[in-house]
Amino acid sequence: MSTFASIALAAVLGAQQPAAPAYKREVPDSLIAKVRVSEDSARAIALRRVPGGTIEALELEREGGTLLYSWDIKVRGKPGITEVHVSARTGRILSVEHEAN
């Protein structure tokens, strides 16, 4: 294979890898194997609840025995963040709380 072909193949393969999220992400490997709802689906559910919001952070955690995604969402022009908990098993919104800093 020529050098040019190798470089072109590497560029195509590199382009196929997903980009890293633009937010802080704490997702322990020990918990990821237990989820039934994908991170992408849970993110879409949380963002529908906070229109115009931007994800600042995600934490996959067990809280009170429930496995959940905890999303910190910032809305431009609004102080603080909105925290949305989405069940990692059902996709149901468990709670929404605005935390004004």
Task: Give the location of each predicted region.
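Long, terminal "pre-/pro-" and other extracytoplasmic accessory regions
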Residues: S2-N101
